[in-house]
């Protein structure tokens, strides 16, 4: 647009010049003096008009330039929504998502029948007719606790089961549990134990079943604030008589105690709960509580299960002793001591301590988790052996034993655990007196990041030589005597040359010496002062072949210096292929027929783990005691 205005101004100037030349050609002697003032005024007015018009059009030009990319972006977004396959042609195959599925799709409802099936698993189909029939039945949740110990499997779980569930049988549910926990289905006894345990707990819930069909109907009366029970018809009680139950007072409070451990978190709390409050819902209370405390959904289900389980204990106890739930006084002294007295005031300050009724969350370490796990197993066995108090031939539940909930998270195959095996292995090779199984896994997080760099071969050799020099200096700081020239630590180039030398397999190799039981006088017990000298002596006694790599000699000396009372032999077998690494194995004299391959890397770390094991320590003590008895 600016170019058009400039060209128009230039044309006006050309026109004015042409007009002036025309006047000159007509015979006028001074064109500028003869220029008409009106013509100049018109030319200036036209020029100002064009300039003002250009300033007004700048805003429209900017708006037009902004609208074009915005409109193209909107068109691209619309095309991606309507035709997702066009994203592949525009952005490449990476936009398809591969295992994550398609992106930028319209949201849609995914029904269970449309879910992607996991390989090797199956689900039980539910028809619409069965779902419609199930929706018309009432919901009565039974707290279920599984404690299954079979073969090498230990299953502990807690959940709620709908008493009127008609969609799936207990056997099918038990099979689905085994599938979810990767328990092979050929273990039929585990499936049977799960279904029998659930069925037994449902049968124990029968006394509560009659009371679960009672609902509260408020008596709209200004004179009384009492509540009336009304009987609701259901499938199971359709033939029962619909007799009216007398009015009762809605105040039967108990003390709920929570002790829930999930993973590393332990929740401890206690609060009062009314057994027959019409607005009390264990699930809603657990949801609000976990939201306030910032806990996960696993705690939500555990809190609701614990509330229902403890309420069921009191309901079962009262039903078995013949209590009619008619608001009368409870005659049994034991259960009366657990029932809280009626409330007289809404606010209480004197009879209630806020510290004892406040939730507490503890984070457990590995030792505390293991100790709590053992205590939970011991308590579970004790509760199975213990029988409740019998009264009139009826076994009553023990209200003193409040069941705890202890859930250990199921290990995931995709999410790695916190333990690093290589880190534990490095700790085991550097620790004195700890085996690989005894390493404390509660180590602080490492602040270093492993970065892989591309280094030249020459630079890599220099780096390796420098690291070997550092190891040599650290080794000499242990007050070891200097090694002979024949046993000096060579560089990595020497090891490469030794590895590339032709194989000497089949040639005359010096036989390995046969060691007998060391006597007391022949350094059976070494002290720190002569440990370096004895390491060299043992090194010479091994009589290693000439083609033994230098790192093997170094590891032998380090092992003898670190474990002076242990006896072992090193077997070096050359490789048939010169490009391969020769085989180095270590034979322990105390443990018969036990051979260990050198490693990891150019170390004897695997053999050091064996020397630190308790079984080897016991055999070594037996040998040393035998030597002592023989010399005395």
UniProtKB/Swiss-Prot annotation:
Its main location: nucleus. GO terms for cellular component: chromatin; nuclear chromosome; nucleus; RSC-type complex; SWI/SNF complex. It is found in: Nucleus. InterPro entries: SNF5. GO terms for molecular function: transcription coregulator activity. Keywords: Chromatin regulator, Nucleus, Transcription, Transcription regulation. Pfam families: SNF5. Belongs to the SNF5 family. Component of the SWI/SNF complex, an ATP-dependent chromatin remodeling complex, required for the positive and negative regulation of gene expression of a large number of genes. It changes chromatin structure by altering DNA-histone contacts within a nucleosome, leading eventually to a change in nucleosome position, thus facilitating or repressing binding of gene-specific transcription factors. Component of the SWI/SNF global transcription activator complex composed of at least arp9, arp42, snf5, snf22, snf30, sbf59, sol1, ssr1, ssr2, ssr3, ssr4 and tfg3. This is SWI/SNF chromatin-remodeling complex subunit snf5. It comes from Schizosaccharomyces pombe (strain 972 / ATCC 24843) (Fission yeast).
